[in-house]
Each structure stands twice: as C-alpha cells, then as structure tokens.
A protein has these predicted regions:
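Structured C-terminal cap/extension of enzyme domains
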Residues: 73-281
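Glycine/proline-rich, positively charged
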Residues: 1-73, 79-87, 91, 109
Length: 281
C-alpha cells in the first residue's frame, strides 16, 4: 500500500510522525492485511530524498523519464536504501508520447517514442516498474515491443540519446543548452509565483521536440495544480508582475531578457485556457 502524494514537508511529517500514517500502516502490516509500504510523490527531489532516508518505506512511485531526469539522484538513493522504484505515467507525462510530434518520431527512429522511453527508463537498473496507461490498443503493443527489446536496449538507446542531445544543442544553442536552468529562482520566491524553471523547460521542449500539445497542457495546469504541480504560469506577466520584478530575481541567470521573452511567447500561445488535473476532470 502506498501513501499517495507526499508532496510537501507537511505531508511527510504527517506520514512519519508518532501516530501518523506509517504507524497505522505498520499495524495493518502486522495483521497481515497489507504487504509492502511505499509512497507516491510529485515533490521536489530534496523532499523525496528526505522521505527515502527515513528508511520507513519499501518502495517509491515517482516521475522520471527521458525529458525529465531531475530525480536521477533520488533513484540512486532509493537503490542504496533497497527501495523499489515505480515510474509514474512515463507515456503521458513523458511528453504525450501516445501522440508524438513528427520530429520526435523522426529522432527516435527506428523505435517509436513510447518504446524508446520505456527502454530508456528500464535500462536504469535501479528502476523496476513502469505504469503503462493506454490511450489506444496500439499503445499496449508498443509497450510489449519495448519488453521484447529489453535485452537489446544498448543497441538502440545510446544512439537515439546522442541524436536527441545533438538536436537540442543545434536548436537551443550550446550556451543555452548547458546553462538555461542555472540560477533560476524557485516559484516560491518569484513574483506571482511564476514557475520559471518549469516554463523554460516547456519552452525548450517546444523548440527542440515540437511538443506543443504537451507544453500547452502543462502550461494551463500551472496555477491550478495545487501541490501536485505547484506555481503559476506566465499569465500574470505584464499584468500584476512587471518585467522589472522578474529581472530582479533573474540577476544571476545567463540571459534574463531571453527568459522573459520566452515567458511572453508561452503566454501568447497558451494563456487563454485553464486546465485541470486528470483526477478533477
């Protein structure tokens, strides 16, 4: 049984405190009503590491896939503590790979992007399980294809990764590729709670992989995702939040003006609608 959504420090406290969730689950475990105890999370890597380091859990469900490898160190720590690692929604949150862009299809050849991403995840020996939400029957066949190719993953994956990396450098420029995410303010410390790191990531995905549909969905969820997808999108830019305010918190960044221009572009593209989490639809 997994404690669902340890996304904040308060959530973790409620889970591990005396008389909290873990104590209750241990009693159920002793009564042979449940087996292993884990947790799922959309939280920051530092929070997930803190939860793993309590040594109170048997497994963790988290997000990690090719386009978002932020939790790589978390997965390595989970191995140190002998935790099972379950990857949440690698097809959908991994870039809407059920409806991939033509560019993504081309860059992942000879594999379908779903197959590539599955193999990318499972070639990491510290990853044990993927969830495979299926939009259509053909998607399931692609996941089975990935399983059939597990023993051959090294034949395909390094070449595709190199191709994707080179395209990223070609499109974004080497300087931006290497430095775009350095010295960015966290959303909590940004005027309007604008989540600049996530927004720049989405902008990069559009420019690099033509992931406009995925970027639109994530952009429109910001501001409506609570602790599951925290912070706000760029809709407040030039309304309640001025360029000058953002320049102040971006002082250490390699190109603050470029950041703001990218935020404006996202607002122009996607600022007309609000999305809801899947569980709220």
């Amino acid at each position: 049984l997994a404690i669902h959504g340890i996304n904040t420090v308060e959530h973790l406290h409620q889970a591990i405190r005396n008389g909290g969730c873990i104590d209750i689950l241990r009693n159920l475990q002793k009564a042979n009503l449940i087996g292993s105890i884990g947790f799922s999370t959309h939280g920051k890597s530092s929070l997930i590491e803190k939860a793993i380091s309590t040594n109170l859990f048997d497994y963790v469900n988290l997000h990690w896939y090719y386009i978002n490898q932020e939790n790589t160190k978390v997965i390595n720590l989970a191995n140190k503590y002998d935790l099972g690692v379950f990857i949440i929604s690698p097809t959908d949150k991994g870039g809407h790979l059920h409806t991939p862009s033509n560019k993504m299809l081309e860059l992942c050849r000879p594999l379908h992007p779903i197959v590539f991403n599955d193999l990318f995840c499972l070639r990491n020996k510290n990853v044990h399980t993927l969830s495979v939400g299926i939009a259509k029957e053909a998607d399931f066949k692609l996941h089975l294809e990935a399983v059939s190719l597990l023993s051959e993953s090294e034949k395909y994956i390094p070449k595709i990764i190199n191709r994707l990396r080179q395209e990223s450098i070609n499109v974004l420029g080497l300087e931006w590729y290497q430095n775009w995410d350095r010295n960015l303010p966290s959303w909590e410390y940004t005027p309007g709670n604008i989540n600049i790191p996530v927004l720049l990531w989405l902008s990069n995905l559009i420019d690099w992989l033509d992931m406009e549909g995925f970027a639109r969905a994530r952009y429109q969820l910001l501001g409506n995702g609570s602790h599951w997808f925290p912070g706000s999108n760029a809709n407040l830019l030039d309304v309640d939040v001025s360029e000058g305010q953002l320049l102040t918190v971006l002082e250490g960044h390699i190109n603050p003006k470029k950041v703001i221009n990218k935020l404006r572009t996202l607002k122009e593209k996607f600022g007309d609608k609000v999305a809801k989490r899947l569980s709220k639809k």
